[in-house]
Design a protein with these regions (language model features):
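Compact, glycine/acidic-enriched structural inserts
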Residues: 116-160
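Polyanion-engaging groove/track-forming segments
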Residues: 97-98, 110, 127-130, 134, ...
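Membrane topogenic helices and adjacent juxtamembrane segments
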Residues: 1-11, 119, 146-177, 193-207
């Protein structure tokens, strides 16, 4: 557990590939990055470590995460004011900044703020009535990468005899990994898992 946390706090390409497979990372050259992705920490992480460009399934299908398009298309860019309902319909001024999609989780898009580097959730179902903002995910793309790696490490324990215990430890690990953010992303994921695990564990105890 301590080794997992140390690796998740400072994820390397080697560790992430041990979680998701050799060749699974999108590691663009500096010139390949979007110009409006201005946050230096994000740019450095992408060009030196890389971000998982994967479709997560199997043990991790509970996350329903897909970032596979990064390698072929790069991150989708959009005006965050437009996404999150902060722009009036008659405002045709140029975007002040951009946010970049680095994957989808369930029905939400994970949007990295191009200026400050934080990761927010965008709900496309709320776009047309100023309800696109669905909460915080992580303080940085680096932290999101570490959290995805942790999920990969915990996955087999969720299939074991004590999934609720594993889930509680996973929640604590996510909180310790990114203490500045109460992640709405993992709250949604873990609440759904808890609903699934509780009856399954009760059946196991009764048998």
């Amino acid at each position: 557990m301590n080794e997992w946390m140390a690796a998740a706090r400072n994820p390397t390409a080697e560790w992430l590939e041990s979680c998701f497979g050799v060749g699974s990372l999108w590691r663009p050259a500096e010139a390949e990055l979007p110009e409006r992705l201005e946050h230096e920490g994000t740019r450095e992480f992408l060009t030196t470590v890389g971000f998982p460009a994967v479709r997560i399934d199997g043990f991790l299908d509970f996350i329903d995460f897909d970032s596979s398009r990064l390698k072929t298309e790069g991150p989708w860019a959009e005006d965050p004011d437009e996404l999150f309902g902060q722009r009036t319909p008659d405002d045709d001024s140029p975007p002040r900044s951009y946010a970049f999609e680095f994957g989808k989780c369930q029905e939400f898009s994970l949007m990295v703020d191009g200026v400050v580097g934080c990761v927010d959730l965008y709900d496309p179902n709320g776009w047309d009535h100023a309800a696109g903002y669905a909460g915080e995910a992580h303080s940085s793309l680096k932290a999101l990468s570490g959290a995805l790696g942790l999920a990969a490490q915990f996955a087999q324990r969720f299939e074991g005899p004590e999934p609720l215990k594993a889930l509680a430890e996973f929640r604590t690990a996510i909180e310790d990994l990114d203490p500045l953010v109460e992640s709405d992303l993992w709250e949604k994921v873990t609440e759904a898992l808890e609903e699934e695990f509780e009856p399954a564990e009760e059946i196991g105890q009764d048998s």
